[in-house]
Design a protein with these regions (language model features):
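Short helix/loop capping segments that flank catalytic or ligand/cofactor-binding pockets
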Residues: 4, 82-85, 178-180
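Short intrinsically disordered coil segments
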Residues: 9-10, 88-90, 141, 183-189
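Extended oligomerization regions of viral-like shell subunits
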Residues: 40-173
Length: 189
């Protein structure tokens, strides 16, 4: 580090922080997904009515067991593509890109766009995560959230290694998760 360009060290630290963030994201989504026992079937992911039925069935299960409704829908990039491109029996998008030319959003059960992961299928906040092992929805916001994730980033740490006249650099932090109530979540299968 004594002879390193500060800009190159900054690049390395940024890459370590990104790797740390991906690892904690993967931990959180895997832990949440593994604890969910309720399921709702999407018969055909290309059929809009099947998505609508699965989302409402999941909402029914969550409401029946907890008296809450889902707030978020977590999907893989593959499920996001299937959901956003699903059509009704008239070949109209179920979740259209609002504001597109010649598309007034009639029949809109939410919206989606190919240039953003933002969307709101049936009013749910859409979260697209490549680390998700599968798609699910749940009551994930507010004081009664069913799943909690805590993280404290400690940042970079370095240790001199005299034997090699070098220095080891790492990025560290603490992460913990807690499934407070698995009945507030439903997996899509």
């Amino acid at each position: 580090m004594d002879w390193s360009d500060p800009a190159s060290i900054d690049i390395i630290l940024n890459q370590l922080a990104i790797a740390y963030g991906q690892a904690t994201d993967n931990y959180a989504v895997d832990t949440c997904h593994a604890a969910i026992t309720q399921t709702s079937s999407v018969a055909d992911t290309a059929v809009g009515a099947d998505w609508v039925a699965a989302i409402y069935e999941g909402a029914r299960q969550i409401s029946l067991n907890t008296n809450y409704l889902p707030t978020h829908m977590f999907v893989t990039p593959g499920s996001w593509a299937a959901l956003a491109s699903s059509v009704d029996d008239q070949n109209r998008p179920v979740f259209p890109f609002v504001g597109a030319p010649n598309l007034m959003g009639q029949n809109a059960a939410g919206n989606a766009a190919a240039n953003t992961w933002n969307g709101n299928p049936l009013g749910l906040v859409l979260v697209v995560d490549k680390n998700a092992p599968g798609s699910f929805m749940g009551h994930a916001a507010g004081p009664a959230a069913g799943f909690e994730f805590y993280e404290q980033q400690k940042g970079a740490i370095s240790v001199d290694v005299p034997a090699t006249l070098g220095r080891t650099i790492a990025f560290r932090g603490y992460a913990a998760s807690f499934m407070a109530d698995a009945t507030k979540f439903v997996k899509f299968v």
